[in-house]
Design a protein with these regions (language model features):
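A surface-exposed partner-binding patch
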Residues: 1-92, 158-184
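Long, low-complexity, intrinsically disordered segments enriched in glycines and aromatic residues
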Residues: 39-152
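Protein C-terminal end segments and domain termini
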Residues: 150, 154-160
């Protein structure tokens, strides 16, 4: 799995989070939070058996896409799990936090009341069952570079203001993104 991490976490952040909510996180997941503190995972798919889901984000601590912010919408006490990420459609991935399910990863479909559907016995297994594609160089090219490419290919008639706006948004989103392989 490739991730554009939110920055390094710290053992202090993780321990403070665990104390605040009275939970103990799986050791591998703790190491993940310390090393990456979550991040964006564009072009990432989790596949295991017949299950196939996009993975858009893995949440971190004290960042925009945070575990705590998403706990507000997710009945984590009832589910004995906390939200750790999301797919492209607003569904959650969660990780077990009780003695009986610690470290188990679930898919939580919002159309099914966020019911826990087990997809991996461990967070490490979840990471290993994902596949990511690198963000293409085209996605990182400027509007001007894209226009020049279409004109060179005789397709200038396809260029519209709407397309330029789409390109501009994509460029701004991906121009500085750095993806790295998540530890296994």
């Amino acid at each position: 799995m490739l991730i554009a991490k939110y920055g390094n976490g710290s053992i202090e952040q993780v321990e403070e989070f665990e104390r605040k909510y009275g939970i103990n996180l799986d050791e591998y997941y703790r190491k993940f939070l310390i090393k990456y503190n979550g991040g964006e995972t564009p072009n990432t798919i989790f596949r295991k058996g017949k299950v196939s889901e996009t993975v858009r984000y893995l949440y971190g601590l004290n960042v925009e896409q945070s575990i705590e912010k998403n706990m507000i919408y997710f009945d984590w006490r009832k589910n004995n799990s906390i939200p750790i990420g999301a797919d492209n459609f607003g569904n959650y991935f969660s990780i077990g936090i009780s003695e009986n399910n610690n470290g188990i990863v679930y898919f939580c479909d919002h159309e099914r009341g966020f019911k826990n559907i087990k997809i991996s016995d461990t967070f490490q297994g979840f990471v290993e069952a994902t596949h990511s594609e690198m963000i293409s160089d085209f996605a990182k090219s400027t509007v001007e570079e894209r226009e020049a490419r279409l004109i060179a290919n005789g397709k200038e008639h396809n260029i519209t203001d709407g397309l330029r706006n789409l390109w501009r948004k994509e460029y701004e989103k991906y121009k500085d993104i750095f993806q790295e392989e998540v530890m296994k």
